[in-house]
Amino acid sequence: MWFKNLQLHRFSAPWSPSADEVEASLAKHAFFPGTSLEMQTQGWASPRDNGQLVHAVGRQMLLTLRTEKKLLPATVVNQVTKARAAEVEEQQGYKPGRKQLRELKEQVTEELLPRAFSIRRDTRVWIDPDNGWLAIDAASTAKADEVRGMLFKALDALPLANLHVNQSPVAAMTDWLSTDVAPAGFTVDQEIELQSGSESKATVRYVRHPLDAEDLRRHISGGKRCTRLAMTWNDRVSFVLTDSLAIKRVAPLDVIKEQADGTVSDEDERFDADFTLMAGELAGMLGDLTEALGGERKA
């Protein structure tokens, strides 16, 4: 249930449509399997496969963007096109020109698409109107951009903006390491990436390695800055903070797993309980992290 990544966004103005209103908007852009000739299709799908495009618990909402893509490697298309071009050359007595090659490639693609395998990828979105958060469970900015574009397409006048803080993650993480003092409520874990600002981009990584304060200060004095830092919030949630303010490898710790209601036996109730727990914990963590980065800066 828990998101593994958090690409963070803020509501720049109050936004409080009901789950039913959001459902109606998403329904206009719902996912449908692609035809045999479509390379890729996207649309909103049910997070619980129960037909509902918005899974709501209280004011918290969970959405799912589904992407279906045909697996048709360019090397396969190019090989078949090359063979087809050789046949055409033999028939007409001269090599096909650029336009003819382009048409051959399009023809080959159309012939191969119906036989190509399809893969589906679901990307989840958590919306917390009360605390003003919208987070996308995507490891890369490119995938998050896809989701954001579909959100803007489906939800009119969505007041969405990136999170801006008063102290950059790089400056803050570097300061925490150089002073050997983590912000209140957080601890630094045994994974760090330090990178030089020079053209060489010289990089030092610590992975599951004890951190030596003097060694870290030496790297920082030499001009390196922290670009990735593994941390734990209140002994409850571990994560990796990056220089772009994306949060990766989010994981609940044992204290949260023990807190989960073990008396819930119904699968739907369990899902709702887990979602509520995740939303509450992440909202608290994000609030504290924002403060640790100097507070939110209004763009």
Curated annotation (Swiss-Prot):
Q: Does the keyword Cytoplasm apply?
A: yes
One annotated Gene Ontology cellular component of this protein: bacterial nucleoid
Q: Which InterPro entries match?
A: RdgC
- Please give the Pfam families that the UniProt record associates with this protein: RdgC
Keyword Cytoplasm attached: yes
Gene Ontology biological process terms in this record: DNA recombination; regulation of DNA recombination
What one GO molecular function would you report for this record?
Answer: double-stranded DNA binding
Record keywords, A-Z: Cytoplasm, DNA recombination
State its location(s).
Answer: Cytoplasm, Nucleoid
> What role does this protein play?
May be involved in recombination.
Protein family membership: Belongs to the RdgC family.
Its protein name is Recombination-associated protein RdgC
Organism of provenance: Cupriavidus pinatubonensis (strain JMP 134 / LMG 1197) (Cupriavidus necator (strain JMP 134))
Gene from which this protein is expressed? rdgC
